[in-house]
UniProtKB/Swiss-Prot annotation:
Keywords associated with the record: Repeat
Protein name: Uncharacterized protein slr1152
Lineage, opening ranks: Bacteria, Bacillati, Cyanobacteriota, Cyanophyceae, Synechococcales
Gene3D superfamilies linked: E3 ubiquitin-protein ligase SopA
Source taxon at top rank: Bacteria
Keyword Repeat in annotation: yes
Occurrences of domain Pentapeptide repeat (ranges): 50-89, 90-129, 140-179, 185-224, 230-269
Organism for this UniProt entry: Synechocystis sp. (strain ATCC 27184 / PCC 6803 / Kazusa)
Length: 331
């Protein structure tokens, strides 16, 4: 049994480690959380490499605690206050962090495989290099968090607040991002394979040159986003909002834009082969002759053979046609 903690009058400290209680890997073989909590109350903050597997720390206040490289596998941390905590390199597989307060905490390179962070508060938290495959982050607030190079394969981020978060080189393969807010997030070099982005909020994002091939993006909000040279081939964007988006040079081969809103979008140099555009709002959109060269399914329904209003502009000939589409022939 762990010896009782002695609190000296002049200095409070965690008891010296008895190596007989530790494995050859330096991890505690037994851990009673009561001495830990008492030590925390007396100002001790460093508890690195402890064994807290399956420990119940739910609801406790552990602000700025140092659990670096601690074993927290299967631990209960529901509603625990871990603001500014040091949890780097921790083993947290299957841990329950539902509604935990993790704002500005360091979870870099932590293993959170299959962990639950449902509704957790992790604003400006550092998850760099963390493993979050199969984790639940639905309704979590990760605004401004750093998730660079994180493994989010198969993770559930339904309706999560990911605004302004850094996902550079993150892996979202098979992840659920339905209704998630990604506005102003950094997805540079992120992997989005079979990612579900239906009804996701992606306003004013830089998605240029990304591969968004074959994704479910129905109802996504992409207002004002940059999709220059982006590969959207064979993706479904039915009912998506692309108002004012820049799709210059984007690959829309086989894309389904049924009922999408492209008002004011820049569609120059787009590859349209076999794109489906039934019921699209083209008002004030800018396009070029590729709209007429390639096989676009549904575009003909908006075309009539009446004379068009043609005038010479600074960028070339602007032709008002297809129910509001303005095709700019750059010359």
């Amino acid at each position: 049994m762990l010896s009782l903690i002695k609190i000296a009058a002049a200095q409070t400290q965690w008891p010296k480690r008895d190596n007989s209680k530790y494995s050859r890997h330096g991890v505690s073989l037994s851990m009673n959380i009561n001495p830990l909590l008492r030590a925390y109350e007396h100002g001790v903050r460093r508890f690195p490499r402890e064994n807290l597997q399956n420990a119940d720390l739910s609801g406790f206040t552990l602000i700025s605690v140092d659990f670096e490289r601690t074993n927290l596998i299967g631990s209960n941390l529901q509603r625990t206050f871990l603001t500014k905590a040091r949890l780097g390199h921790c083993q947290m597989n299957w841990a329950d962090l539902t509604y935990a307060k993790l704002n500005q905490a360091d979870l870099s390179h932590a293993d959170l495989t299959k962990a639950s962070l449902y509704g957790a508060f992790a604003v400006k938290t550092n998850f760099k290099g963390a493993k979050l495959s199969g984790a639940t982050l639905a309704h979590a607030n990760l605004r401004g968090a750093n998730l660079e190079q994180t493994n989010l394969t198969g993770a559930n981020l339904f309706a999560a607040n990911l605004r302004e978060a850094n996902f550079q080189k993150a892996d979202f393969s098979w992840a659920n991002l339905q209704e998630a807010c990604l506005s102003l997030a950094n997805l540079r070099d992120a992997r989005l394979w079979a990612t579900d982005l239906r009804r996701a909020f992606m306003k004013e994002m830089d998605l240029s040159a990304l591969s968004l091939h074959g994704l479910a993006m129905d109802g996504a909000k992409l207002t004002g986003s940059c999709l220059r040279d982006t590969n959207l081939s064979h993706s479904s964007l039915r009912g998506a909002n692309l108002r004012g988006a820049d799709l210059t040079g984007a690959n829309l081969t086989g894309v389904d834009l049924t009922g999408a809103d492209l008002m004011g979008a820049n569609l120059t140099q787009v590859v349209w082969h076999d794109a489906v555009v039934e019921g699209v709002n083209w008002e004030e959109a800018i396009a070029d002759q590729s709209m007429f060269r390639e096989g676009i399914l549904g575009l003909g329904n908006h075309h009539n053979h009446r004379s068009h209003n043609v005038h010479q502009g600074r960028q070339g000939l602007n032709i008002s046609c297809f129910g509001g589409l303005q095709a700019a022939y750059v010359i």
